[in-house]
Amino acid sequence: MAKIIAFDEEARRGLEKGLNTLADAVKVTLGPKGRNVVLEKAWGAPTITNDGVTIAREIELEDPYEKIGAELVKEVAKKTDDVAGDGTTTATVLAQALVREGLRNVAAGSNPMGIKRGIEKAVAQVTEKLLEAAKEVETEEQIAATAGISAADPAIGAQIAKAMYAVGGGKLNKDSVITVEESNTFGVELEVTEGMRFDKGYISGYFATDMERLEAVLEDPYILLVSGKISNIKDLLPLLEKVMQSGKPLLIISEDVEGEALSTLVVNKIRGTFKSVAVKAPGFGDRRKAQLQDIAVLTGGQVISEEVGLSLETADLPLLGQARKVVVTKDDTTIVDGAGSEAQIEGRVNQIRVEIENSDSDYDREKLNERLAKLAGGVAVLKVGAATEVELKERKHRIEDAVRNAKAAVEEGIVAGGGVALLQAAHVLDNDLELSGDEATGVRIVREALTSPLKQIAANAGLEPGVVADKVSQLPQGEGLNAATGEYVDLMAAGINDPVKVTRSALQNAASIAALFLTTEAVVADKPQPAGAAGMPGADEMGGMGGF
């Protein structure tokens, strides 16, 4: 495909125009009085959202240079979302401010490489200042405030804080699994699952012990974990006899249980001879093996697998796991109070954390995080309902963002919200870091850009941005504008805070992309095809569908 090339100022201005188009659509959502954006979908109802990265992903521009500029800013939003789970709009606003001021100085004759170095040094200093100013999250109220701001609903923030405590063993835990599900009921309900839950239920409905609830409840069972299929009852019989003699029920988790092995278990369950439940192992392939091993560690058992030289025929009771209780429905299995040793569980948790750090795949990281949380302390489910499908999607998305926001707060602490932490951290740049020339210009660009989130929040609230920024810059540390009321207050005391991880990630990612913009000297893009060039021959004459 033929290419078109733009150089120098033309290249940078094309990129900037794309950035501005995207940023202008995103920044109207910032702050408590920010607006929503409606996104048309190819099918189904439109989506209404105030999430920066969701809006950014939907924007596709026609001009090739503008399209590249927009794609670069999408990367800012996406990277911030990946790292911190929120702050995508703040990152976009910062990127726009840095690029605008930077390009103005480059056009006036400044050296872009010098400006880039100045920006990088300034961002490093501001990041250090933010981390110093961060306060650890110590109470449920602080988490509720942080999550409530992100979700734009204090009641939802309180539910998220309650969920984090419930699955964190009575303390805040960033590894807690909190899932958000759509519900037919109205409002938000919290359901906490103690222990480990995975999404596989009993293989046969005959295993149910409570026909009203359609669930099988096993008290103090043995747990048999098998990596392959079980079909031959002769392989299983020696172990079954030993379990029967112990008087305990048996949970079997394997790739599958079929044929005479399944029918024998069902018949004995119906007759009341022996209580057991067979469940398919969760996941597929290598992920299934890993999850089986997780369950083995949690329950104090071993996975029966030829790979480690173990077979069903020779298996004995010490190889089986145990738990205080197991509840199996048609859809999922919950293991409560596994008998695994704390040291082994902690070792497994640390191993999964290392895998998360080394993974390049978002999907793999998500699955590893799920495994981590199941081992680290249970699962909380927030069930979300709303009057319409459009409202339900918007609400669910908002709550998912708030959950990630809360976890980020636990991880690195919180700072004053409302764009105030960035503006007040800018004081470390007052002497231009004792730099000179173009590097000092880069520092001044960052100092000016740090006021942009607060100014945008003020603008969205109908206030004069410049006046608000001047007023806040003169206030004591941590005091600033409560845009919801228009008052100037101690933000931390008022529960208006942001996770420092979100704030610093937004700044670092915005600065990274801004530096690329400023140092760009040429842009190579695909040459746009003339309208209709990609269509079928004769499409114009035949209505585009061969005359049909």
UniProtKB/Swiss-Prot annotation:
Catalyses:
ATP + H2O + a folded polypeptide = ADP + phosphate + an unfolded polypeptide
| Residue ranges of the TM segments | none
What does the record give as EC number?
5.6.1.7
Q: Record's family?
A: Belongs to the chaperonin (HSP60) family.
Q: Which GO terms describe its cellular component?
A: cytoplasm
The molecular function GO annotations come to: ATP binding; ATP-dependent protein folding chaperone; isomerase activity; unfolded protein binding
Pfam annotation, one family: Cpn60_TCP1
Provide the binding site for ATP. 29-32, 86-90, 418, 482-484, 498
Q: Where does the protein end up?
A: Cytoplasm
Q: What is this protein called?
A: Chaperonin GroEL 2
Gene3D superfamilies associated with the record: GroEL, GroEL-like equatorial domain, TCP-1-like chaperonin intermediate domain
Q: What are the protein's UniProt keywords?
A: ATP-binding, Chaperone, Cytoplasm, Isomerase, Nucleotide-binding
Instruction: Please explain the role this protein plays, according to its UniProt record.
Output: Together with its co-chaperonin GroES, plays an essential role in assisting protein folding. The GroEL-GroES system forms a nano-cage that allows encapsulation of the non-native substrate proteins and provides a physical environment optimized to promote and accelerate protein folding.
Q: Which PROSITE patterns match?
A: CHAPERONINS_CPN60
One GO term (biological process) = protein refolding
The family database entries (HAMAP family) matched by this protein are listed as: CH60 (MF_00600)
NCBIfam families found in the cross-reference section: GroEL, PRK00013.1, PRK12849.1, PRK12850.1, PRK12851.1
